[in-house]
Amino acid sequence: MTEVVAALESSLYPRASTSFSQEDLVDEWSDLDLERNTRVVRDGDRVVGYGAVRGRGELWRAEGYVHPAEHGRGIGKLLATTFERDAAAGGARRIHNGVYEPDAVARRLLKSIGYRAVRVFREMRIELAAPPPVPTWPEGLRAATFDPERDALAFHAAQTEAFADAWEYTARDFESWSRTNLASERFDPALWCVVRAGDEIAAGTICTANTYGGGFVQILFTRRPWRRHGIGAALLADAFRRLWEGGERRVGLGVDAESVTGAFRLYERAGMTPALGWVQYEKELRATG
């Protein structure tokens, strides 16, 4: 299945290096019931398209990929409409479907079946040529490496609170969050940062190595009372340094291009540049039953 993504990315971003691996796919699907939430389209023994849908409550999210050599066969529409039915059966009132920004074929398809574009996301990257500097933390804050036994519950709560004002954020309970993060084969507490103000967690990062072809900043957050004090820049510098010390020379992250926190501009100032882009499309669903 990773060959489908590699072929699609190469056709859309010929100058970008494609690095989606089987391990990346396993991590992305770690929280899914594969029988219920994923679909694979085959032509004989060859995978020509696949995707997944997930969600709770009124909003579900889908994504699908079709090998560029197989465009025009109705595979994308089959995946999209199947996910709509799955989401509606699960109680969804709306569904989001994300496609690569330059994928005109997928964008036309979604528009033709009733979707509208609602948001743009970017993957940003940086190549590290030298050891990143040690970050400077604002007065009164102290940074430490994540300790699962000591920090897990409070970290999850702080992350959930920090993302509460993010666009269309869906909170995850501690059990689900733990499965994705703490039970992952890529979990390395040395790549996580916990920033405290007194006894409270004010900010933090979750990073993983060997993800999408390099180090990856999965989560970077600052709780609202501590925003606008330079913590985000310090967190990013700390993430770069941890990943560098772990042997990574390329670092990536995903960002809402319209984030109210100004995250996109923060990452640009740190030297990161957009490598890939996705457009989120939305459709209202009719109730089933």
Summary of predicted features, one role per range:
Residues 40, 54, 63-73, 220-227, ...:
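A short, internal acetyl-CoA/4′-phosphopantetheine-binding micro-motif in the GNAT/acyltransferase core
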Residues 1-26, 136-171:
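Short amphipathic alpha-helix that is part of the acyltransferase structural core
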Residues 72-85, 222, 228-245, 264-269:
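Conserved acetyl-CoA-binding loop-helix of GNAT-fold acetyltransferases
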